[in-house]
């Protein structure tokens, strides 16, 4: 580009000189003043032309240098820990990028204010919503997370903890697998309840067809309920004192032994 511009300038200078000499052929005495003025004008025109061409060349070079130096300027303004992140992701293995994202998320959690950290329970619920109902986490994996269990116990009612929560989240075909764990949860629920209120549950076998009255029956009096509670307590104590092979004896034999 520069060589072409120099060639053009040289050709222009040669043309101007030949024209000036061709016009200066008449007598010098008559046209002496005019030749000097023409020479001055030509020199000024040539100088202006050279300056304009050199200025254009300098502007083009400055623009090219600015484009090449822009990444360096951008790198200087960036944080030292964030430089070359895109290049690093391109060079990494595709299977290792997700691990780096998890590490970055943990680092963000550490740098956040304790009062502004995301709730683990809310994130777990969001994960459950995005998963397929048949592919959600199994009950054993949930119970291994103490933070999730503590958060769940804080939000639930004391008498209703761990009873119906898992059955709602599990697949309908897998609810029967956890019947034993549900039985353990019911025992834990009975331990936490008041002793006088354990037998007021409609689903208990003690309030079956042999019960003197139903709890929901308006004709059932408090005296009958108290008698029923006393009979149940005496029956349980008698069964504890008996031999394991004789616990199936009728109620009359139990009363005679007492």
Curated annotation (Swiss-Prot):
Assigned keywords, A-Z: Amidation, Cleavage on pair of basic residues, Hormone, Pyrrolidone carboxylic acid, Repeat, Secreted, Signal
Top-level lineage group: Eukaryota
Biased composition regions of type Basic and acidic residues, renumbered to the chain: 84-98, 107-119, 184-193
Chief localisation class: secreted
Single GO molecular function: thyrotropin-releasing hormone activity
Disordered as annotated region, ranges: 84-124, 166-215, 236-258
Modified residues (Pyrrolidone carboxylic acid): 78, 92, 112, 131, 156, 170, 193, 242
Pfam families membership: TRH
Modified residues (Proline amide): 80, 94, 114, 133, 158, 172, 195, 244
Family in the record: Belongs to the TRH family.
Functional note: Functions as a regulator of the biosynthesis of TSH in the anterior pituitary gland and as a neurotransmitter/ neuromodulator in the central and peripheral nervous systems.
Protein name: Pro-thyrotropin-releasing hormone-A
Organism annotation: Oncorhynchus nerka
């Amino acid at each position: 580009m520069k060589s072409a511009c120099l060639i053009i300038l040289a050709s222009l200078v040669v043309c101007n000189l030949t024209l000036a000499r061709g016009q200066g052929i008449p007598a010098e005495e008559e046209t002496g003043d005019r030749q000097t003025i023409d020479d001055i004008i030509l020199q000024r025109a040539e100088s202006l032309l050279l300056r304009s061409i050199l200025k254009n060349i300098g502007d083009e070079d400055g623009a090219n240098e600015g484009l090449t130096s822009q990444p360096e300027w951008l790198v200087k303004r960036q944080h030292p820990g964030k430089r070359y992140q895109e290049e690093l992701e391109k060079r990494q293995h595709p299977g290792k990028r997700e691990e780096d994202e998890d590490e970055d998320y943990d680092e963000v959690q550490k740098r956040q204010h304790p009062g502004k950290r995301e709730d683990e329970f809310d994130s777990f619920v969001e994960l459950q919503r995005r998963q397929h109902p048949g592919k959600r986490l199994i009950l054993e994996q949930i119970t291994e997370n103490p933070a999730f269990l503590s958060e769940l116990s804080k939000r639930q009612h004391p008498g209703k903890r761990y009873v119906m929560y898992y059955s709602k989240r599990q697949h309908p075909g897998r609810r029967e697998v956890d019947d034993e764990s549900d039985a353990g949860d019911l025992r834990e629920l009975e331990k936490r309840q008041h002793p006088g209120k354990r037998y007021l549950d409609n689903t208990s076998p003690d309030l079956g067809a042999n019960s003197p009255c139903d709890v929901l029956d308006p004709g059932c009096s408090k005296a009958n309920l108290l008698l029923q509670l006393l009979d149940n307590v005496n029956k349980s104590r008698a069964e504890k004192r008996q031999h394991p092979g004789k616990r199936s004896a009728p109620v009359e034999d139990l009363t005679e032994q007492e």
